[in-house]
Each structure stands twice: as structure tokens, then as C-alpha cells.
Amino acid sequence: MGNEAGPIFEESNAEVGTPPADAVHDDFFFDYKNATGYADDCNITGDCNETDDCDITGDCNETDDCNITGDCNETDDCNITGDCNETDDCNITGDCNETDDCNITGDCNETDDCDITGDCNETDDCNITGDCNETDDCNITGDCNETDDCNITGDCNETDDCDITGDCNETDDCNITGDCNETDDCDITGDCNETDDCNITGDCNETDDCNITGDCNETDDCNITGDCNETDDCNITGDCNETDDCNITGDCNETDDCNITGDCNETDDCDITGDCNETDDCNITGDCNETDDCNITGDCNETDDCNITGDCNETDDCNITGDCNETDDCNITGDCNETDDCNITGDCNETDDCDITGDCNETDDCNITGDCNETDDCNITGDCNETDDCNITGDCNETDDCNITGDCNETDDCNITGDCNETDDCDITGDCNETDDCNITGDCNETDDCDITGDCNETDDCNITGDCNETDDCNITGDCNETDDCNITGDCNETDDCNITGDCNETDDCNITGDCNETDDCNITGDCNETDDCDITGDCNETDDCNITGDCNETDDCNITGDCNETDDCNITGDCNETDDCNITGDCNETDDCNITGDCNETDDCDITGDCNETDDCNITGDCNETDDCDITGDCNETDDCNITGDCNETDDCNITGDCNETDDCNITGDCNETDDCNITGDCNETDDCNITGDCNETDDCNITGDCNETDDCDITGDCNETDDCNITGDCNETDDCNITGDCNETDDCNITGDCNETDDCNITGDCNETDDCNITGDCNETDDCDITGDCNETDDCNITGDCNETDDCDITGDCNETDDCNITGDCNETEVSDAADGTDGMFLKSSSSLKLVALCDGCPTEDSPKSSNAKGKGSSVSAGLLLLAGSTFLVLAVGLSAVLFLGRERQNAVVICDNEVMMEEVPGCLSDASFAVPVTQSSDEARP
């Protein structure tokens, strides 16, 4: 050829010797300091000061300070060990581990874990979907939405909304001025000051003061050792143990034990269904409904109704201005002043004065040692021993002994069925006629109509074969058998069985403690409380609350507009329309439509054969079998199997711990967490996270826009479109297209017969067999065989440790490390290298096949450099070579009779080295901005980069 290298080489064939030790890598290296557009990992060990936007698509490891004044968009992990000061938005989709202070003044959106050991000051929104562990102060002035655990050991000051769906453990002060919605445990050891709503569904353990000015709804235990000042509603369904003062100005509804050792001042309603032990003063200005024991050692001043179903032991004064209904023992050692009705079904022992201005109904013993002045009715079914004066101006019905040692003045009817020993005056001015109140303690057998215009108190059986029209209250403690219509306009309290074969129309409350069998329509406009079975064969229309503790079997429509609380089985064969909450603890079998607009809490099986439309939360702990459509707009939490044969549309979270078998479409817009098998034969559209720990078999399309974590097999026969991460630990068999835009980590086999398009990392530890195209833009790490029959385009690193057989083109722009056989029958284009570093006084390059080095000079070739006609590289013996262009320096490797092609980035011109002679078709221009390196392998008859 005769051509010489000219100015390109100082020595065309000189051996330069060993390059500097710090410039030698295992395979080859080059200087990429001046390269632009590098879009893979960045690893920085010194300060990093970036004064404009930083956009990183690979890992970012920074071991010293990072100071960023533009947007920072990181789409993979960021690990920072120095201070990080970001003055504009930070958007991170991988883990972020910061071991020193982070100060952010723009939005911070993190879609994976954040672990921070220094202060974190965020002055705009933070949105985090992975765990967030902060071991020092966090100060946030924008919204904070955390969808996984947050663990904070320093102060946390949040001045806007915080929404947390994982555990929240705060070991120092939390000060929140926006709404706080926590759907899992919160454990707080410092003061907690919340100036807006707090809604907590997990345990809440607060070991210092809590001060809340918005509603507080807690659906699990609250344990507070400091003062608790709540200025709006508190609703608690778990135990509440408060060891210091509680001051509440809104309603307080507690459905489990409350134990309070400090003063308790409640200025609105309190509703408690567990024990309530108060060891200091309680001052209540709203209704107080307690359905278990209340034990109070300080004064108790209640200025509205008190309703207590457990023992009530008060060791100091009780002053009540509303109704007081106590259904178990009351023991009072101080004065008791009640200015409205008192209704007591247990013993009542009062050792000081009782002054009552409303009705007093006592169904067990009353023992009074002070004066008792009652200015309205008293109805007593147990002994009544009064050792001082009793003065009564209303009816007095006593069905057991009354022993009175003081004057007794009764100015209306008295009906007494037990001994009455009065040791002082009794003065009665009213009759006892059935045209007013009737009080009967024996059987009552009426074979025709009974028409009563006053109260009817029957303490034994009533048997009626004609119509019974009662225009005032009926109170029955024995069986009541009515074989024709019953029409009642007052309260009806039945404490034993009621059996009715005609219509029953009750326009006020019905309270039944025995079985109730109604064989025709029941229409109730007041509350209905049934504590044993109800069996209804006609329509049942209830326009207020129904509370049932026995089985309820309804064979026609039930329409309920108030709460319905059923604590045993409900079996309904007609439509069931409930427009308020339904709470069911037994099986619920509905064979026609159920339409529920309030919460529905079912703690045993639900079996529904008609449509089920629920417009608020459904919480089910038994199997749920639905054979027609289910449409749910609130959360749905099912802790056992769900089997659905119609469409299921859920517009909020679904959390399922048993199998879920759906034979038609499922459309879910909230998170879906399934901890056992899901089998779906219709389309499944999930617009938030899906987390599945059992098999998932989908026989039609699955479209998921949130993370999808599957810990067992997934078998999909329709398209699968996932727009966030998919993490699968079992086999994944997909027989149609899979399109994934987040990471995909599969730890067992993947078998795909349609196209697979993944726009983020894919990590596979089992075999992967793809029979159509695979297009991957993130790293792909496969630790077992990959067999692909369509094109495979990978735009980032691929690392494969098993055989890889590709029967069509593969195009890879990142590193590709394959440690076993690769057999490719189509084109394979790989456009990146493995490693790089810079040398001294020019660049050194080492080949794995030869140690012969060529020294390179700076500068571009001149125009009068020699040219050759065979510069395209054909006709020479060609083996492996390497092309490197960086800045204005050519980097050339010459190995024996090998050739290297140089491609200019802009003009596609070529430089060929062959037999140590330079051949060129056209000398490229100065490529100062060139920034790529291409390893090249050519055949002997055509050199193609």
C-alpha cells in the first residue's frame, strides 16, 4: 500500500510499554471526561455542585455533598452520603438513601424507598410510594403523601396534609396542621399536635400529649399516656387507654374499652360499647351511651342523656339532666339527681338521695336509703325497698315487692303484683282501668280484638287472636302470640317471643329480646332492636335503625333506611336496599339484589346472587360469593375468599386475604392487595398498585397502572399492560403481548408468546422464553437461559449468565455481559463498552487478545493525509477491534493483521488501519463532540461496524 500514518501517529508500530497502573482495566479503557449525553450510572466521590437541571437514568451514587439548583430527575437509585441541598423539584423513581441532611424547596416525588439519616426539610410537596425512614427531623410545608411505611425518629412538622397508608412510627414530636389520614399503625412517642382531621385505621400508640382540633377517627386501639385534647369528634373502634386528662368538645364514639385515669371532659356525645373506667371526674354535656361497664370514682355530671348497658358504679355524686337508661346494675354512693327519665334493668342501690323528675323504669331491685321524689311514672319489676319518703305523681307499676318505710304519695295509677309493705302513708288518687294503662303480670289470653289507648305493660304471656290496636306503648315480658294484625303507634318493648301472622305496622320503636316470627309484612318507622331471631316472610320496610343479634331470615324484600346491625346470620331472598350502614357478624345470604349506600361490615360469609351495589366501604372477614355484578365505590377489605361471576367495579382499595375468583371483568381504581390466589376470566383493569401473594390466573386482558407485585405464579392469556413496576417470584406465562413501563423483576421462569415491551429494567432469574419481539429500554439481567425468536432491542445493559439463543436481530446499546453461550442468527448491534478511565499524556488502550500498544497524538488529520481506494475495509483479514472517539483525540488499537473502523459521529466517514497502514476514503472533520465507543467484529470479506 505504501501509505504512511502521517500526523496521526508518532510511531506507527512502536511498542510503548506498560501503561500507567491506574490507567489499565481488564479489557480496555478510554477517557470519557469530555463525553456528552452519557445516560447510565453516575458515581461521584467528591462534592457535586449542579447549577442547572440534572437528569439521571442510571444509579446515582454520591459520596460527598450534592448541591443542585435546577430540577433533579433521577429515574433509578440515588445514594448520597453528604448533605444534599436541592432548590428545585426532585423526582426520584428508585431508592433514595441519604445519610446526611436533605434540604429541598421544590416538590419531591419519590416512587421508591427513601432512607434519610440527617434532617430533612422539604418546603413543598413530598409524595413517597416506598418506605420512608427518617432518623432525624423532617419539616414539610406541602402535602405529604406516603403510600408505604414512614419511620421517623426526629421531630416531624407538617404544615399541610399528610396521607399515610403504611405504618407510621414517630419517636419524637409530630406537629401537623393539615388533614392526616393514616391507614395503618401510628406509634408516636413525642407530643402530637394535629390542627385538622386525623383518620387512623391501625393502632395508635401515643406516649405523650395529643392535641387535635379536627375530627379523629381511629378504627383500632388508641393508647395515650399524655393529655389528650380533642376539639372535634373522636370515633374509636379499638380499646382506648388514656392515662392522663382527656378533654373532648365533639362527639366521642368508642366501640371498645376506654380506661381514663385523668379528668374526662366531654362537651358533646360520648358513645362507648366497651368498659369505661374513669378514675377521676367525668363531665359530659352531650348524650352518653355506654354499652358495657362504667366505673367512675369522681363526680359525674351529665347534662344530656346517659344510656348504660353494663354495671355502673359511681362512688361520688351523679347529676343527670337528660334521660338515663341503665340496663345493668347501678351503685351510687353520692347524691343522684336525675331531671329526666331513668330506665334501669339491673339492681340500683342508691345510698343517698335520689330526685327524679321524669319517668323511672327499674326492672330489677331498687334499694334507696334517702328520700326518693319521683314526679312522673315509676315502673319497677324487682323489689323496691325505700327506707325514706317516696312521693310519686305519675303511675307506679311494681311487679314485685315494694317495701316503703316512709310516706308514699301516688297521685296516679298504681299496679302492684308483689307484696307491698308500706310502713308509712300511701295515698293513691287514680284508678287502674284498661282504657288507660294496663299492667298485667299473668297470662293474657284474648280471643278477639284488643284496643288499648294507654300504655300496656304485660309481664307474662299475651295471646291474641283478633286485631290488636295499641295506640301507646306496649311493654311485654312474656310470649306474645298474635294471629291477626298488630298496629302499634307507640314504643313496643317485648322481652320474650313475638309470633305474628298478620301485618305488623309499628310506627315507633320496637325492642324485642325473644324470637320474632312474622309471616306477613312488617313495616317499622322507628328503631327496631331485636336480640334474638327474626323470621319474616313478607316485605320488611324499616325506616330507622335495625339492630338484630339473632338470625334474621327474610323471604321477601327488606328496605332499610337507617343503620342495620346484625350480629348473627341474615338470609334474604328478596331485594335488600340499605341506605345507611349495615354491620353483620354472621353469615349473610342474599338471593336477590343488595344495594347499600353506607358502610357494610360483614364478619362472616356473604353469599349474594343478585347485583350488589355498595357506595361506601365494605369490610368482609368471611367468604364472599357474588354471582352477579358488584359495584363498590369505597374501600373493600375481604379477609377470606371472594368469588364473583359478574362484573366487579371497585373504585377504591380492595384488600383480599383469601382466594379471589372473578369470572367476568374486574375494574379497580384503588390499590388491590390479594394475599391468596386470584383467578380472573374477564378483563382486569387496575389503576393503582396490585400486590398478590398467591397464583394469579388471568384469561383475558390485564391492564395495570400501579406497581404489581406477585409472589406466586402468574398465567395470563390476554394482553398485559403494566405502566409501573412488576415484581414476580413465581412462573409467569403470558400468551399474548406484555407491555411494561416500570421495572420487571421475575425470580422464576417467564414464557411469553406475544411481543414484550419493557421500558425499564427487567431482572429474571429463571428461564425466559419469548417467541415474539422483546424491546427493553432498561437493564436486563437474566441469570438463566433466554430464548428469543423475534427481534430483541435492548437500549441499556443486558447481563446473561445462561445460554442466550436469539433467532432474529438483537440491538443493544448498553453493556452486554453474557457468561454462557449466545447464539444469534440475526444482526447483533452493540453500541457501548464495559469500562473506562483516563491515562496520562494521551490515552493507552489494551486489547484482551494482544498487548501490542500504539501511542496516540492529539489533533485531527490534515487534508493532505494519504487516502486509499479500499478504505471501506473489504478484502482484508479482519478480526476483533475497537473504535473509540473522545474529544479531538483518535484512539486506535492495532493488533497484527487486524482492522479497526472509525465512524465519524456526524458524517459517517471511515478510517481503516490494515497491516499497520492507514487507509482512508475521506478524512473526517474534527470530532470534538464525539462521545461514543463501538467494539467491532468483522468477517474476512466485509467489515461492518
Curated annotation (Swiss-Prot):
Membrane topology value: Single-pass membrane protein
Membrane-spanning segments: 883-903
Residues spanning the signal sequence: 1-23
Sequence repeats: 40-51, 52-63, 64-75, 76-87, 88-99, 100-111, 112-123, 124-135, 136-147, 148-159, 160-171, 172-183, 184-195, 196-207, 208-219, 220-231, 232-243, 244-255, 256-267, 268-279, 280-291, 292-303, 304-315, 316-327, 328-339, 340-351, 352-363, 364-375, 376-387, 388-399, 400-411, 412-423, 424-435, 436-447, 448-459, 460-471, 472-483, 484-495, 496-507, 508-519, 520-531, 532-543, 544-555, 556-567, 568-579, 580-591, 592-603, 604-615, 616-627, 628-639, 640-651, 652-663, 664-675, 676-687, 688-699, 700-711, 712-723, 724-735, 736-747, 748-759, 760-771, 772-783, 784-795, 796-807, 808-819, 820-831
Region (Disordered): 1-20
Main localization of the protein described in the UniProt heading: other
UniProt-annotated glycosylation sites, renumbered to this chain: 34, 43, 67, 79, 91, 103, 127, 139, 151, 175, 199, 211, 223, 235, 247, 259, 283, 295, 307, 319, 331, 343, 367, 379, 391, 403, 415, 439, 463, 475, 487, 499, 511, 523, 547, 559, 571, 583, 595, 619, 643, 655, 667, 679, 691, 703, 727, 739, 751, 763, 775, 799, 823
Location(s), subcellular: Flagellar pocket; Cell membrane
Ranges for region 66 X 12 AA tandem repeats of D-D-C-[ND]-I-T-G-D-G-N-E-T: 40-831
Its job: Supposed to function as cell surface receptor. Possibly involved in receptor-mediated endocytosis.
Protein name per Swiss-Prot or TrEMBL: Cysteine-rich, acidic integral membrane protein
Organism: Trypanosoma brucei brucei
